[in-house]
Amino acid sequence: MGDKAILTEVLEASNLTEAYVDLTAKQLIKEIRHVGDDFAVRYSNLDDRTELGEPTDQRSPDSEKTFTVDEAVEALGFGRFQLKLSILTGMAWMADAMEMMLLSLISPALACEWGISSVQQALVTTCVFSGMMLSSTFWGKICDRFGRRKGLTFSTLVACIMGVISGMSPHFYVLLFFRGLTGFGIGGVPQSVTLYAEFLPTAQRAKCVVLIESFWAIGAVFEALLAYFVMESFGWRALMFLSSLPLGIFAVASFWLPESARFDMASGHPERALETLQAAARMNRVQLPTGRLVSSTKAGSESRGDIANLLSPDLRKTTILLWCIWAITAFSYYGMVLFTTVLFQSHDECHGGLFSNGTQMEVCQPLTRSDYFDLLSTTLAEFPGLIITVLIIEWFGRKKTMALEYAVFAIFTFLLYFCLDRFTVTVLIFVARAFISGAFQCAYVYTPEVYPTTLRAVGLGTCSAMARIGAIVTPFIAQVASEKSLSLPIGIYGTAAILGLIASLSLPIETKGRQMMDSH
């Protein structure tokens, strides 16, 4: 058989027209190698397709269709795939909450064991949040460049290992060092929201992100219960060991996490994105849109994880306001958590000595069973905060919901100025904590929505870093300044909430009903 006949058979087997017989063997081989599954030939080096007799009559109608990740995610809806993702990413939030709640529980025990001052107690919290602040942007860049799943896995492994080691600390300053490293690992946990949000359809995204925060509430309540049963019998070291275990469990479970399809498209791997979306469609028992998966932007045309892009003209105002909102919210939320312990340890008949010279606290004053019970009661406020946010966020919008929750927090915080009994103080703290918790959830919904895929993780990372600045400062207000006057922290936290209200209403973009962007 001659060369021309062989080439003709190859052309027919490849569904190419006879017009290609005039090509040289080298050209022909190059064209055949570019034949895709839809039999559409790619012309990378030829200017005029018609000269080669493009086989338009050979294409199926579906081969001309395309769809984006946004369209695929909308088609997926909310099903078994998202439920599995909710549980896996929720485990990270539960572990994070336990580590954060731990900070308010161990300080009195450390004061009894090592005789540390209130400033040193505040340093324990400050070191953890310093580590989180330093690492939040780092983990955001890792997730934007190497993938959400890898960043989450490594960050939780670091947090788990350092958390266990810190429980073996022989000295206070050794404890500070390892708690700082624990915080460095925990700084990557918020990226679980980035991964989760990128698989949620627009209509359900806000409610689902808020609902995943219920795992935070579960973790906080579980930590309070754990302390109730463990601290008196086994001490703070045992509590620290047990509190680190969920981080290790999540690190192992993260191997079952899917990589973000949006990340794969943005990083130039559409085949991986399609595999993930097809697996999700099979699990949800739905069909993806017909056609070929394409990106709404050219792969690699925009740098990923570049912090400077957060301050580009179209994002600058949003970014600066979000940094303020996150710092204020963390300052107020963690401040109320720490301040609750201070209030419950006060001996003043007004339960807080609001107009006296101090709280008259002893160096060693461990929490009692009654204190743990009241801490548990105020921690349960996380749940109504979540429910309220879920009910109003889609109706009221993200910005107005945040503003409303800041306003309620400020009102109930200022009410603590009055001379009140312990039960009334507990109720006021319960309501205040419910609404500041809700404001935090709104920030976690809004931030991934407002940033494009190429900046989403680093945007959330920098916001998380700003939150840690607020959290670093707040122990010195809640635990140190309160020794002089409890009226000072109350005034500061109430005023901070008013500033948060103004900042949230000043945000230039409302993301309610808005699809996630791939680029800016």
Curated annotation (Swiss-Prot):
InterPro entries with a match to the protein in the record: MFS_dom (IPR020846), MFS_sugar_transport-like (IPR005828), MFS_trans_sf (IPR036259), Orgcat_transp/SVOP (IPR004749), SVOP-like_MFS_dom (IPR047969)
SUPFAM superfamilies for the chain: MFS general substrate transporter (SSF103473)
Cytoplasmic side: 1-85, 142-157, 201-208, 259-319, 394-410, 456-461, 510-520
Molecular-function annotations in GO: transmembrane transporter activity
UniProt superkingdom: Eukaryota
Transmembrane spans: 86-106, 121-141, 158-178, 180-200, 209-229, 238-258, 320-340, 373-393, 411-431, 435-455, 462-487, 490-509
Location(s), subcellular: Membrane
Gene Ontology cellular component list: membrane
Extracellular side: 107-120, 179, 230-237, 341-372, 432-434, 488-489
Record keyword Transmembrane present: yes
Keywords: Membrane, Transmembrane, Transmembrane helix, Transport
Chief site of localization: membrane
Membrane protein topology class: Multi-pass membrane protein
Pfam families for this protein: Sugar_tr
Family classification: Belongs to the major facilitator superfamily.
NCBIfam families: 2A0119
Protein name, per record: Putative transporter svop-1
Organism in which the protein naturally occurs: Caenorhabditis elegans
